[in-house]
Swiss-Prot record:
Organism this protein belongs to: Trichoderma harzianum (Hypocrea lixii)
EC primary class: lyase
Listed name of the protein: Guanyl-specific ribonuclease Th1
SUPFAM superfamilies: Microbial ribonucleases
Disulfide bonds: C5-C103, C23-C84
Length: 106
């Protein structure tokens, strides 16, 4: 999966790295650094996420290309389900308030 969030393009390897990190934290029942990520994503926006079922978890995907380890999460998130399948990539960029919109290509 590749994605474009606002003006930021994420390669398939970047999406994979973020989703793999999220999966490892979910399976371990832990979070990145002192953060709350990954955490349950309630999907108030009603995204369809490739027909996958909840629970969904959101985890930051960083424009720097590094894997999130704590600190500022930025605007973009990879979403996985409980089986660690990539559900989609979403962003606060272009959304109102604390809501999300889908990134292009997802």
């Amino acid at each position: 999966d590749t994605a474009t969030c606002g003006k930021v393009f994420y390669s398939a390897s970047a999406v994979s790295a973020a989703s793999n990190a999220a999966c490892n934290y979910v399976r371990a029942g832990s979070t990145a650094g002192g953060s709350t990520y990954p955490h349950v994503y309630n999907n108030y926006e009603g995204f369809r996420f490739k027909g996958l079922s909840k629970p969904f978890y959101e985890f930051p995907i960083l424009s720097s290309g590094k894997t999130y380890t704590g600190g500022s999460p930025g605007a973009d998130r990879v979403v996985i389900n409980g089986q660690c399948s990539i559900a989609g990539i979403i962003t606060h960029t272009g959304a109102s308030g604390n809501a999300f919109v889908a990134c292009g290509g997802t």
